[in-house]
Amino acid sequence: MPLAFHHVAIQCADLARCERFYREVLGLPVLRRWPRDGGGDRSVWLSVDGAGTGFLALERADEAPAARPWRDGKAGLHLVALRIGASERAAWEGRLEAAGVPVVHRTRWTLYFHDPEGNRIGLTHYPEDA
């Protein structure tokens, strides 16, 4: 079996706010919730591919993240990029704007922005050209 992505996990100090962002702004449906001892969620899994075979895991964190510029030169995960169709790009840009999410960088193929906790996210149609 060839290697394939299973999931990406992002730690969130405000899990509910992050879940709302990924569900309401990006339209990712909830696959599963993992409860936390004492109530609430420890983790929320969101489908990225519509089939549930690739997902984004939002994990509860204990402290808020430090603000980071778009490129900070530090090693580690730089961004999570999600695939869109080239013909959908303008609609996605409008959706982000309507939700108050600023696009911080653009290329020919990709829109870059931050989630509520400063994680870098991209919507890309690379290498598809429209």
Regions found by a protein language model. Give the residues of each.
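Short glycine/proline-centered loop/turn elements that form peptide/ligand docking sites
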Residues: 34-41, 130
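Short Asp/Glu-rich motifs
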Residues: 41-42, 115
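Short acidic loop-to-beta-strand element that houses the catalytic metal-binding Asp/Glu
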Residues: 44-46
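Short, small/polar residue-rich loop motifs at catalytic or cofactor-binding pockets
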Residues: 106-108
